[in-house]
Amino acid sequence: MKPTWKKSLTAAVLSVSLVLTASPAALLAEESGAAVQSVRGQYALTPLVRADVKSVSSVRIQDGTKIGAVVRLYNEGNRVTRVPEYELRVKTADGIEYTLRASAANAKAIQPKEKVDLSYMLTLDYIDATALAELSWVEVDEYVYPKLETPIMSVPVNGIVWNGSDSAISDVGAVKQWGEPFMLPVQSDSLQYTPVTLINEKTPQGPATVITLIAENKGTRTETVPDFRIDGKSDSRSYPGVRAEANVELKPGEKKYIHYGILTENDVVLNSLNVLTPETFVQLGASNTPTVESYTVGRLSVVLPPKSTIDINTLPIYKLRDRIAFDPLNKLVDKETEVSLVDLSMNESESAGYNTIIAKFMVKNTGERPVPLPAFQTELTNAEGFRYSGTRQTTSVEQLAPKLAYLVNYSYAVPSSEKGEDLLMKLQDNQTIAPYNIPIAGFKTAVAENKSEDPDMLSFYPYNVKLLSSAVSIQGSATGQFGYKMKLDLDITTVDDVIADVNSANMKIDLVDNSGRMIATQTVPFIGVNKLISGTQYLLFQNLRSDQFEWPLTVKLYESIQTPTGEANRLLKTMKQ
């Protein structure tokens, strides 16, 4: 796969030079518990200037080979010193030597105790350039004839050359296992990264793998996570990753998540990750206009686990109404927002062929200030691994008042064969790194059995309805039309102090004849106009589906909830009249 060399114009070489000059940081870092990427060691270039090879690359392009090298120089003195005016050359394994061109943005001097990165590049028409073996600094005196060349120092590079995104990292010290912390000393000696979750999901753009790292500042001053890329690698090719967060600042001791989304292809299995850092080279055009060429260099490889990293066996068994434990680093649900699952039921749908699971979550603000109502996403996974995404109830509420709770429903369309016995519930953040979902909580659960010690006590969470008595009678009219009148005596109580939407739960009443046909129906809310109340009330059924009198009748009481796919009904009680 040919590499992509991005080109962009800048206003001045000075601005590019500022970008290329990093803040002071040692290349070698000793971090207990973290696998630190080794560097080539430091070399004495002059009595005051020491050198390191930061990166070397040799990448095939469409018309040849592009060789890049970046060296890092340190001023060990107490005064500003000039960058030695040496040529940088590269030698192949066949003994062919090339002189690299210096970037127009390379620094001319080094502040005391500071460092600078010098970039070099050369494009060859020769496609089959052999492996690079050595970098060397050469002092050239062009003011004598013949010109005088004095070798200063040579550094072996045969083990660190990057050959492009599809190449493999074979250095044992640069291959890390999943979950093993690592650092990138070429960027920072204080920031540590630990891969923690890997999730495969489908997106409108195609299959994607979402990687989550914990970035931790081990140092003593605030740092910004530098730019680096993570690519996914299969057996045949690599897939570029994109970081979701633009600017991540870490105070000393602080931890934050950073995420990468890697778009792949159908049936592709990633087996490793390549961690790459950016390099730049600036060249001047005919009119002294600077052009920046950006490229990346592989630093280390992370071996991927064979499947998603969420271990179902480690997730707790959930008890309804308990507070759900969220990832403490999540950005969607704060510590003062309490979320609990209060009901999980299986419902029949209007259309044949599938059922609907309804999950009711109570979201409570335990703090003293209004907070946003968190719009988390949910997903159910059954024992066979089939995943069902939840559809959130539409609500106009955006803020939670202090000490108040709000009820939010989620619906899941499932096959009619689904029993709902062994389910995994995942709560996800689908906003922080949209369009990807990242898990922020998870637990094992099951659909609640529709059983009650009292057959006349019906649950329409957040309401309990005690059916004291009921009766159905014929209702005639002067025009000869008839209907049915139902008398209901109810005792309605609220289970929790929670604000419920008008569509959170309704009572649906069906009148069914001896043949099992529904001849009349009515849905009555618990909120708003014509709501159900405690005490005696009468309901009229006039829009009948039969033109003749039917008797006896069967009365069926359902909990009815509107979902985007239609009405979902849960049968609560059947009564013969």
Question: Where is each model-derived feature located?
Answer:
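Sec-dependent N-terminal signal peptides of Gram-positive bacterial secreted proteins and lipoproteins
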Residues: 1-30
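A eukaryote-biased signal for short, well-structured alpha-helical docking elements
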Residues: 24-45, 139-186, 283-334, 429-466
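Short, solvent-exposed loop/turn segments enriched in Ser/Thr/Gly
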Residues: 64-70, 207-212, 353-359, 484-487
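Asparagine-centered strand-capping/turn motif at beta-strand->loop junctions
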Residues: 73-80, 215-221, 363-368, 490-497
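Short acidic, flexible loop segments centered on an aromatic residue
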Residues: 80-97, 220-237, 370-387, 502-515
